[in-house]
Regions:
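Membrane-embedded catalytic cores of phosphoryl/pyrophosphoryl-handling enzymes
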Residues: 99-176
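Membrane-interface interhelical connector segments
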Residues: 82-108
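Interfacial segments of alpha-helical transmembrane regions
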Residues: 38, 42-78, 149-153
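Transmembrane helix-loop junctions in multipass membrane proteins, especially transporters and channels
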Residues: 50, 54, 80-88, 169
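Hydrophobic alpha-helical transmembrane segments
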Residues: 32-47, 119-125
Length: 176
């Protein structure tokens, strides 16, 4: 794979993040957020727009997912990069502990799909689509009927950015 190139470029900054903020409660909260809030966000986004009877935004949300996955799959297949916790010595796979609520997810992960991070790409794509949509309508975000949902998506992106470093999952270059 290409993990040694990424590690050579980034060094052990993600290890520093993990060691600097290590906390059991934070680990549990971020593990839950990384898996379940993310799943809620990606499943709920198109459904939210459908329930609001905004078919245009529902279509755009699904198109966002399709494009992001079309871009990501070749990287997963041909540019294998291990997750940070399986490559950096001393880095713990915090999320991959034995817990009843994480067992299914942690047992099926091959730990070799470190680039790109869909946890950042999908919600960031939604934000971009939202901004482009309100621009095309000629309105401000404060006037848009989905502004609260947009704020929810925007608030989760920094949490994902920190979580993927802290939990020992992704490299910094995954999100650039």
């Amino acid at each position: 794979g290409f993990t040694h190139y990424v590690h050579g470029f980034e060094g052990e900054l993600t290890l520093w993040v993990q060691q600097s903020f290590r906390n059991e409660i934070l680990s549990d909260v971020l593990s839950f957020h990384y898996l379940f809030v993310y799943l809620f966000l990606i499943w709920f986004s198109p459904i939210y727009y459908i329930l609001c009877r905004d078919e245009v935004m529902a279509d755009k949300a699904v198109l966002n997912y399709s494009i992001i996955y079309l871009l990501a799959v070749p990287l997963y297949l041909f540019f294998n990069v291990e997750v940070t916790s399986s490559f950096i010595p001393g880095m713990d796979a915090i999320m991959y502990h034995e817990s009843w609520n994480l067992f299914f997810f942690t047992e099926v992960d091959p730990l070799d799909n470190g680039i790109p991070s869909l946890h950042v790409g999908l919600p960031l794509g939604l934000l971009i689509i939202n901004r482009l949509h309100i621009r095309s309508l000629g309105i401000k975000m404060a006037e848009w009927r989905h502004r609260e949902f947009d704020l929810f998506v925007a608030a989760n992106i920094p949490i994902y950015l920190f979580s993927i470093q802290y939990l020992g999952i992704h490299w910094i270059s995954d999100v650039i």
